[in-house]
Swiss-Prot record:
<keyword id="KW-0804">Transcription</keyword>
<feature type="compositionally biased region" description="Polar residues">
    <location>
        <begin position="373"/>
        <end position="383"/>
    </location>
</feature>
<feature type="modified residue" description="Phosphoserine">
    <location>
        <position position="351"/>
    </location>
</feature>
<feature type="modified residue" description="Phosphoserine">
    <location>
        <position position="264"/>
    </location>
</feature>
<protein>
    <recommendedName>
        <fullName>Serum response factor-binding protein 1</fullName>
    </recommendedName>
</protein>
<feature type="modified residue" description="Phosphoserine">
    <location>
        <position position="205"/>
    </location>
</feature>
<keyword id="KW-0007">Acetylation</keyword>
<feature type="compositionally biased region" description="Basic and acidic residues">
    <location>
        <begin position="183"/>
        <end position="195"/>
    </location>
</feature>
<dbReference type="InterPro" id="IPR015158">
    <property type="entry name" value="Bud22_dom"/>
</dbReference>
<feature type="compositionally biased region" description="Polar residues">
    <location>
        <begin position="146"/>
        <end position="160"/>
    </location>
</feature>
<feature type="region of interest" description="Disordered">
    <location>
        <begin position="311"/>
        <end position="429"/>
    </location>
</feature>
<keyword id="KW-0805">Transcription regulation</keyword>
<feature type="modified residue" description="Phosphoserine">
    <location>
        <position position="203"/>
    </location>
</feature>
<feature type="modified residue" description="Phosphoserine">
    <location>
        <position position="279"/>
    </location>
</feature>
<dbReference type="GO" id="GO:0048471">
    <property type="term" value="C:perinuclear region of cytoplasm"/>
</dbReference>
<dbReference type="GO" id="GO:0030490">
    <property type="term" value="P:maturation of SSU-rRNA"/>
</dbReference>
<dbReference type="GO" id="GO:0030686">
    <property type="term" value="C:90S preribosome"/>
</dbReference>
Length: 429
């Protein structure tokens, strides 16, 4: 902080050089005039000698002022309060001292020096205030750092206490959680031991029950052979009735297929195909119907085959077990097989006949419909040709572009150029 103050003061001293030089010139002029007045005065010899001594001293001051440097004048003026009268009355005062005092006392220079002195004083006071403020700031920072350290210590202590308390709580909760787990394990073990004993006690009783059931069954079987044969015949009758019901269901499905596949739909389809030009889409539609009927037929056949196999198995069992009622049993399966065969072959014959009818009807209808449509196609083709010819004629009648016309004329002229009819000139001529 001291260097900028001194630098500023030195700068001010440098700025004062011009003022000092200007004031020095003014003072020298004044002194020259006073020297001339003193030499021109007349009087007694003592007065003349006195005036000569004064004039000599003024000349010495003038020469000293010329040799003085302006910085020296300003520094001496700023340093001490100069009193010109005191310095002149001193017998030992030199010409340079008197010259400096005379320049410093000049009113113009005195004003500037007073301003500089006030600035220096203000700078010193500001410097003292800055040091005081810095010292106060340092003291406050020290106090703040001490407070923060104290607060941090308190916070760390509180955190440690909180962590210790939380750890204790966690340990207590773990201990409490372990106790019910052990209790539950003991209860489960007790429960497991109880049912095991019960099962061990009950298990010996099971084989005795099984033995009793077997003995009862063995007692029942030799006593009632007739009842067994009757029960088997009843079972066979029930199975036959279920098979007949299934066969009736198969007949109903085949009848539904027949209703779904009527001749009226075929006739309508072929009429539509004969009227429309795109017959492929109709064929695809009808082929889709045929595929659906095939899927249903295949499902019917599979169900009927399974029924037939079951019937054969039941028939074998009946023939092996019952010898007394063979005639009745033979009559019943024969009728059932006839029914099954009739249902089975009827569905197949019906589907085949429907397919044959479809194959036979389709070419007939097409052979009948296409000759009727032939004149219509011819008329349409003729109309299209006539329209194209009319369009080409209209295009030819339209005016050509001028560039096309010019090229056409040029070609005509080139084709019409007459052959050269003059004499050929040779070098001999």
């Amino acid at each position: 902080m001291a260097q900028p103050g001194t630098l500023n003061l030195n700068n001010e001293v440098v700025k004062m050089r011009k003022e000092v030089k200007r004031i020095r010139v003014l003072v020298i002029r004044k002194l020259v005039r006073s020297v001339g007045r003193l030499k021109s005065k007349k009087g007694t010899e003592d007065a003349l000698l006195k005036n000569q001594r004064r004039a000599q001293r003024l000349l010495e001051e003038i020469h000293a002022m010329k040799e003085l440097k302006p910085d020296m004048v300003t520094k001496s003026a700023l340093g001490d309060d100069i009193n010109f009268e005191k310095i002149c009355k001193k017998p030992d005062s030199t010409a340079t001292e008197r010259a400096i005092a005379r320049l410093a006392v000049h009113p113009l220079l005195k004003k500037k020096i007073d301003v500089l002195k006030a600035a220096v004083q203000a700078f010193k006071e500001a410097r003292q205030n800055v040091t005081e403020v810095e010292s106060s700031k340092n003291a406050s920072e020290d106090n703040h750092s001490k407070n923060t350290l104290y607060s941090n210590d308190n916070g760390s202590n509180l955190q440690r206490e909180g962590t210790v308390i939380s750890e204790q709580e966690v340990k207590e909760t773990k201990i409490l959680a372990k106790k019910p787990i052990h209790n539950s394990k003991e209860k489960i073990a007790k429960m497991e031991h109880g049912p095991k004993a019960v099962t061990i006690a009950n298990s010996p009783s099971k084989p005795s029950e099984k033995d009793s059931v077997i003995s009862l069954e063995s007692q029942k079987t030799p006593a009632d052979p007739k009842l067994k044969t009757l029960s088997q015949t009843k079972k066979n009758k029930e199975s036959d009735s279920s098979l007949s019901g299934n066969s009736d269901g198969g007949e109903e499905l085949c009848e539904e297929e027949k209703e779904y596949f009527d001749d009226s739909t075929e006739e309508r389809f072929y009429k539509q195909s004969s009227m429309s030009e795109d017959s492929d889409s109709g064929d695809d539609f009808f082929i889709g119907k045929v595929r659906r009927t095939r899927k249903k037929e295949s499902s019917c056949h599979s169900s009927v085959k399974e029924q037939k196999r079951l019937e054969k198995v039941f028939l074998k069992e009946d023939t092996g077990e019952t010898h007394g009622d063979t005639r009745n049993d033979k009559t019943k399966p024969s009728t059932e097989t006839r029914k099954l065969e009739s249902v089975f072959f009827h569905s197949l014959s019906g589907s085949k006949s429907s397919r044959r009818n479809f194959k036979e009807q389709a070419p007939k209808t097409r052979s009948l419909d296409f000759p009727q449509n032939e004149p219509q196609f011819k008329n349409q083709f003729n109309k299209k040709l006539s329209r194209r010819l009319e369009n080409t004629k209209q295009q030819l009648q339209l005016p050509l572009h001028p560039s096309w016309e010019a090229s056409r004329r040029r070609k005509e002229q080139q084709s019409n150029i007459a052959v050269f009819q003059g004499k050929k000139i040779t070098f001999d001529d």
